[in-house]
Amino acid sequence: MKFKEVVYNGTPVTEEHKIVKILQKEGFYWLIDSETEDACIEIIHKTIIWNSGNFYSGNWHYGIWKNGNFYGRWENGIFENGTFKGKFISGIGDPSVRV
């Protein structure tokens, strides 16, 4: 399952077809096109907050990464925690310089 849960307008949504419709409505086509597994996310003020799950491939355009496994191309956003094995282009919390 690509998406396990999306919290949207304070309401958890767990049915994948409903999650995809929400992502389309908000313009997050890049996330729909990415290869993900068991993603638990929130949408707050038109920003993706990734709480857990796997992002295997695709371009992460912008959002806040709280936790999970990232293997894609990070174009911009805030990386707070998790496993990073992707390519970092720009953003805050560059995982390649962590000690």
Where on the chain are the PLM-derived regions?
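Short, intrinsically disordered N-terminal pre-domain segments
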Residues: M1-E15
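Extended beta-solenoid/beta-helix repeat architectures
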Residues: T14-V99
